[in-house]
Amino acid sequence: MGESVERGLILQQKWEDLSEYVFAAILRDMPKSERFTLGADMRGLIWQVEEALVQLSLRTGNRWALLNMVDVKAKTLLSMIRLGIRIRAIADKRYEPAAQRLVEIGKIVGGLKKTGGERPQSAEYPRDR
């Protein structure tokens, strides 16, 4: 099994671990008023990333775009968690474990993008020299 494929599988497992933590520790303890607004948005985002990771594992779609989307959604999820803490919908102690998992996921995504992402060649993405 190639290193890129193996790291992709690790990425999917790390995302599933994060999802389990978010569902069990963060969303379950949210106040009802926030669970159906911010919580629903967080759930939707988690499933969008899971869908992209399945596409990556099946090798369908543009790898670079999918990895980029996973990276953006992971950062968005971290922002949502920070917002939840600021509005007192999420306990402060829940931030650090979630942030550590998201940072680890970001590192894996960055490594995958570096080693084999099909970067689109356009004016927005000039060639590295």
Question: Where does each model-flagged region fall?
Answer:
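Amphipathic alpha-helical assembly/interaction segments
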Residues: 1-129
